[in-house]
Each structure stands twice: as structure tokens, then as C-alpha cells.
Amino acid sequence: MKNTFSRLFGFGDKESEFELQDESHEEIDKKVYEEIQEIPIVNITPNRYQPRTVFDDARIEELALTIRTHGLIQPIVVRQYEDDKYEIIAGERRFRAATKLGWEKVPAIIKNLNDTETASVALIENLQREELTAIEEAVAYQKLIELHNLTQEALAQRLGKGQSTIANKLRLLKLPEEIKSALLEKSITERHARALIPLKNEELQLKVLQEIVEKQLNVKQTEERITKLLEEAKPKRKAKQKAVSRDTRIAMNTIRQSLQMVADSGLNVNSEEEEFDEYYQITIQIPKKK
């Protein structure tokens, strides 16, 4: 079943030109294939809109060995942006594998796409592969929202995802860079990162991040730690003070003034006031000898 890219993101007559298929999300409709060309690798640059920021060297090496054995079955897809200069639309992993093999040229199909279309294809193609980290996925959603001026709900409908899925991913982008880096490097999981969001305070978030990594805290332990920190941060409730009658105030002030007069006379008087629910207690100590 085809997931027509142009229908989802409103590229009008481009529908017949570019389609993504469930069987191979990088595959361009064969009916509109241009002739495959051999393009020098030095003339090709990665997609500037590529959401993937971390490439697994081991998996690229595996792909390179497969290509060496079986050849490059699926050409990469590029667009020309200057004379003899091309930008990858789809197939950066294949491009990297071919580069690792030392190829001078790589089979490619040239498509005529503008910046918005190129960015959208790269983002959608990677999202459908479900190999992105949580942060890369969040960045891809944010870019699609900006490119097509969509709401979270509209994007969710176009991608066939729940709005809460989109919203939860986008919240990760508000976290400090150190936490996002930890997610990219897979030092912590997405659930760890999401547990940190309620803390708000960046210093506390980074403190807990350090604890997660150093103590190898699981998600439950992390959530319990954060719950404790949130409880500690709550303002303490002040005890409700009962109204004091005028007569009581006069009595207290009279006693205090009397004690001050005694002290002024040179006698060392110690006093202590205590407040209870129903009464005040004043304890006075007067020395027998001056």
C-alpha cells in the first residue's frame, strides 16, 4: 500500500512524481524514474535536512560488505543544486557505505525537488524507518511542523500517529543540551528523559542525569528520585496563627515592659515565651543574688 507523500504534505501535481512505499520507503515510483546516472562521489553532499545525527559505524560497515558482495541494488536519490553539484535526497547510508568501499562514482537518480520537498522527503523517509533516536525523531517532527505550518494535531493525522506521541517527543526538545546529548548517545532512555521534564530547574535536571548515568538508575528509580526532589521543593505551609485578643496583647506587652524595667535596674533576668494552641506561657528566671 502506498503512502503518497504529496497527498500528505500538499505538493499538488508532484503526486505522480514522488511517492514513498511501505515496502521500501526510499523507493521512488518506477514509472517516473529518470535514467540512472553514475555520479562522482566527490560531487555529492549529504542532505542538509538529514534528521539523523548519529550513524552507527558498525552498521555502515555491514552495509558496505553487503554492497561489495551483491552490488548496490537501490540507487541513491539526489537533486542537482549547482553545476555538477548534487545533494542527497534519500540513501545517505548507502552513500557512506560506497564511500567506505572507495568507490569513485555511485549510481544515482536525479530528481527535481525544491528545498521544502527535499527536507520533507528526508524527514519522512527516516521517520518511516523507525531507526531514529528520540531526539532525532523530535527534531524531525519540529521541522515538518515548521516547513508546512502545521499544528501538532495536523502532523499527527498526516503521519498516522497519536497527537500525544508527537507532543511527548517535542517536549524532549526543551531539555538541556546535555540531556539531549545523552539521549543521542543512548546513555539514557527516552523514559528517563521524560521523567526529568517535571523538574523544570536545569541544575536539578543535570544533577539527576549524573545520578542516572553514574548509578545506572532504572526508570522507576529515576521517577522515585524525582518525586522526592519535587516534594522537597514544595514550599512549607506556615502554621495558621490564631487571632490574639486586644486584652491578651496588652497583658503580654505589660509583662515585657516590666521585664525590661527590671533588666534596666541591673538585675539579670532571663525570660522565655512559648505559644500554645490555647495560651501563651512566659517563664521568668530571677537570680537570688544580684
From Swiss-Prot:
Residue ranges of DNA binding: 153-172
InterPro entries: Chromosome_partition/occlusion, HTH_ParB/Spo0J, Nucleoid_occlusion_protein, ParB/RepB/Spo0J, ParB/Sulfiredoxin_dom, ParB/Sulfiredoxin_sf
MF annotations from Gene Ontology: DNA binding
Pfam family, one: HTH_ParB
Cellular localization per UniProt: Cytoplasm, Nucleoid
Gene Ontology BP, a term: positive regulation of sporulation resulting in formation of a cellular spore
HAMAP family per record: ParB_Noc
Main localization category: cytoplasm
Keyword annotations from UniProtKB, A to Z: Cell cycle, Cell division, Cytoplasm, DNA-binding, Septation
Keyword field contains Cell cycle: yes
Gene Ontology cellular component terms for the protein in this record: chromosome; cytoplasm; nucleoid
Alphabetized Gene3D superfamilies for the sequence: 1.10.10.2830, 3.90.1530.30
Coiled coil: none
CDD domains linked to this entry: SPO0J_N
Similarity comment text for this entry: Belongs to the ParB family.
Purpose of the protein: Effects nucleoid occlusion by binding relatively nonspecifically to DNA and preventing the assembly of the division machinery in the vicinity of the nucleoid, especially under conditions that disturb the cell cycle. It helps to coordinate cell division and chromosome segregation by preventing the formation of the Z ring through the nucleoid, which would cause chromosome breakage.
Name of the protein: Nucleoid occlusion protein
Organismal lineage: Bacteria, Bacillati, Bacillota, Bacilli, Bacillales
